[in-house]
Amino acid sequence: MTDYSSASPKAVRELIREGKIATPTTGMCAGYAQGNLVVLPKELAWDFLLFCQRNPKSCPLLEVADAGSRTFPIFGAGSDIARDIPKYRVYENGVMTGEYTDVSAFFDDPSRELVSFLIGCSFSFESALLEAGVPVRQIEEGVHVPMYHTNISCAPAGVFSGNMVVSMRPIPTAP
C-alpha cells in the first residue's frame, strides 16, 4: 500500500479521479481537514442545513456548494465532487441503491438539482495522533475506522433525524 500521508489533497483527488486510489482515505493528506460528502436534492437542502446547525458534533459543516455545483471553492478548489472520492454510496428514500466510483450522471441529470455538503471527518485528527506517537490501528491495517450507532439522539430538523454515530480508535496503554 502506498503512503499518501504527505500528499496534497489536490494530488490525492487527481489520483482518485484517475482510478489509482480506490481505498478509504484514512491516513492520507496529513495536516489537512478531510470531509464526508452529502449530496441531496435542493428541496431537502434547507432541512439538512438546519440539521447540521443543530448537531455540530455529529455533522460539523465545513462548506455548502451552490445548487448544481460540482466543486467546493473554499475547501476543494479545482475539485470535482462527482469523481474525486474513491467510492460513493447512493441512497434513495433511505435505501442504498448502489455504489459508484463516478456519480457524474446524477449531477448531469437535468431533472435533479443537487446541493452538496462537506461534513468534517474524524480522519482529520489522525495525523495529530501519529505525530504524538500514538498508533492508529486502521491506518496500520489498511482498514476503515470502526463506527458505532449510539442511543444518543440528534436534534431533528425537517425530515432529518436519528441517533449519533461515533468512530472509535483503540489506543494502547502508555508504556
Residue ranges of predicted features:
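Long, contiguous binding/interaction regions
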Residues: 2-21
